[in-house]
């Protein structure tokens, strides 16, 4: 089920159904659909959304979905999305963050989102040997 086609890359964003329920998928980045809890307050660190209640014609909604998928921007040459992929290697309890674009993944600091925007940009540019990238 295609939710919308991202305008910069021309790549579709899908709503898929997996082993643990619905999730949104975009070029290797994915995000589980999360509904807010009914019996307790929302966690401010979690981006809740019900994909069936969003207006995908609205550019703010599209931006919200891309940010929920941890997309940072787009590669200047191949137009593929650049974003953060979080993976749990093996049976370890620790999660590892990677900056990803296409098939290339480069490990990045776990505190990536706490870094200043300028420092984040430097890491992305260094990871893919680029001078600039189109940010969201």
Task: Tell me what each language-model feature is.
Residues 1-136:
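Basic, low-complexity terminal or inter-domain segments flanking catalytic cores
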